[in-house]
């Protein structure tokens, strides 16, 4: 019998997956899997169990938000495991699932995992950590990891928006230098993202035609602080239209980025806090994971 490691965050989102647990497990059992179930107990737990047990099963499935997926992927990669992954998105934002058009219905997502085939995708390595879809700094970065879990559960995605609004008074420019595949970009930026996704924070959407989550390249977006109302309007219009040709924006693709910044500048990796670095290298790991999905969902 095939073995599955099922990792579930019972606190993710509005806890909507919890009431479907029996049906999820039934779906997997009927598909011929012996299911080893692990409920996460706190931050880092999914990484630990994926690292310990991920090599010894045929499939690892995680149920939770972007953070749970990040931890699961991190555990598998740190163990050198090439085990296929299934993902049931049950968080507040689910940017990764949105980019891949994965089912947001819990039971449909479970069915997709057992009926689908492994599709290869890239993963980012940030220093000695991993991220599945984004490493970002600057405006609204803090709201992704500082919003209390009970508020996320009560308000869902709205919690991030409200928390971001309260952060407006704390926004400052960050002086950052980046060596992007041998070219240098330096300046004071309001926001920056190194991503492998069309959705960032559920608010900012990149042009799907310019994003391929399996091409070995990141998309890099840097936003300089507008100095007047005209520049604010121009910047917003460029982001909304997904035409990144205004003076405040830098948008390009790259495989590797070396970053020099204030060591006190915080980052977020897939919505989870990462401490600042004076120097850090970010690298695209081409086809580092295999995610089970139906072919018609392949982004």
For the regions a language model picked out, list residue spans one by one.
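ATP/NTP phosphate-donor binding region
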Residues: 1-63, 298-299
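Catalytic core of DAGKc-family lipid kinases
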Residues: 31, 40, 78-191
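Short conserved active-site loop signatures built around small residues
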Residues: 46, 66, 192
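Short Gly/Thr/Asp-enriched flexible loops that form oxyanion-binding sites at enzyme active sites
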Residues: 68-80
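Glycine-rich phosphate/pyrophosphate-binding beta-alpha loops
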Residues: 136, 140, 193-209, 273
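Gly/Ser/Thr-rich active-site loops/lids in small-molecule metabolic enzymes
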Residues: 151-159, 199, 208-228
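ATP/nucleoside-binding phosphotransfer catalytic cores, i.e., glycine-rich phosphate-binding loops
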Residues: 180, 186, 212, 222-299
């Amino acid at each position: 019998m095939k073995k599955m490691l099922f990792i579930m965050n019972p606190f993710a989102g509005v806890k909507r997956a919890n009431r479907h647990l029996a049906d999820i497990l039934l779906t997997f059992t009927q598909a011929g899997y012996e299911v080893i179930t692990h409920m996460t107990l706190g931050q880092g737990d999914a990484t630990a169990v994926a690292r310990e047990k991920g090599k010894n099963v045929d499939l690892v499935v995680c149920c939770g938000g972007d953070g749970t997926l990040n931890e699961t992927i991190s555990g598998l990669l740190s163990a050198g495991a090439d085990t296929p992954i299934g993902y049931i998105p049950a968080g507040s934002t689910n940017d990764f699932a949105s980019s891949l058009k994965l089912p947001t219905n819990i039971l449909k997502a479970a069915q997709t995992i057992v009926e689908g085939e492994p599709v290869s995708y890239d993963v980012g390595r940030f220093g000695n950590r991993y991220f599945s879809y984004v490493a970002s700094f600057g405006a609204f970065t803090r709201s992704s990891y500082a919003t209390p879990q009970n508020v996320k559960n009560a308000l869902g995605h709205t919690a991030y928006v409200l928390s971001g609004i309260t952060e407006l008074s704390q926004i400052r420019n960050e002086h950052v230098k980046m060596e992007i595949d041998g070219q240098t970009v330096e300046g004071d930026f309001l926001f920056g993202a190194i991503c492998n996704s069309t959705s960032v924070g559920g608010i900012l959407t990149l042009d799907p035609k310019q994003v391929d989550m399996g091409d070995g390249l990141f998309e890099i977006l840097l936003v300089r602080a507008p100095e007047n109302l005209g520049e604010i309007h121009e910047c917003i219009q460029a982001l909304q239209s997904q035409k990144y040709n205004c003076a405040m924006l830098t948008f390009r693709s790259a495989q590797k980025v070396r970053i020099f910044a204030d060591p006190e500048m915080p980052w977020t990796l897939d919505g989870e806090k990462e401490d600042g670095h004076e120097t850090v290298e970010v690298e695209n790991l081409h086809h580092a994971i295999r995610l089970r999905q139906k072919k018609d969902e392949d982004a």
